[in-house]
């Protein structure tokens, strides 16, 4: 069992990173705080990812589909599917990205 504070997690780029393998959990999570115009490059993971948008607006591409999402949106991304998001709003984008793996694996395209 672990009790953690978000500020105890590593902050890399634009996200606090929860690595499940370090906590005995079967998943990993990113707590995203992206400034306008920010987002990762097009990439894939060998597992499902679920993005929960908490605040802000993003343009999300999953495969050939591009949509605008905002607070309350949930995006389910199949394994090995190219995807990315960019903060397309004027304020901060906050989202929680759940990775169905205790170890984070990403291939940038």
What are these regions (language model features)?
Residues 6-42, 98:
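A short glycine-rich, His/Asp/Glu-containing loop-to-beta-strand
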Residues 33-35, 44-60:
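Short, conserved beta-strand element in jelly-roll/cupin
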Residues 79-105:
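Ligand-binding loop in jelly-roll beta-barrel domains
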Residues 107-109:
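Short, charged, solvent-exposed linker or helix-capping segments at domain edges/interfaces
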Residues 64-79:
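Short acidic-glycine-tyrosine-enriched beta hairpin
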Residues 57-59, 66, 82, 92:
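Structural motif
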């Amino acid at each position: 069992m672990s009790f953690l504070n978000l500020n105890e997690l590593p902050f890399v780029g634009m996200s606090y990173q929860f690595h499940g393998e370090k906590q005995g959990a079967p998943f990993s999570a990113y707590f995203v705080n992206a400034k306008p115009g920010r987002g990762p490059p097009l990439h894939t993971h060998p597992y499902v990812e679920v993005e929960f948008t908490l605040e802000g607006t993003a343009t999300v591409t999953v495969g050939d589909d591009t949509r605008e999402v905002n607070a309350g949106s949930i995006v389910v991304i199949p394994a090995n599917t190219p995807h990315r998001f960019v903060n397309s709003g004027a304020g901060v984008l906050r989202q929680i990205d759940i990775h169905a793996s205790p170890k984070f694996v990403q291939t940038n395209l």
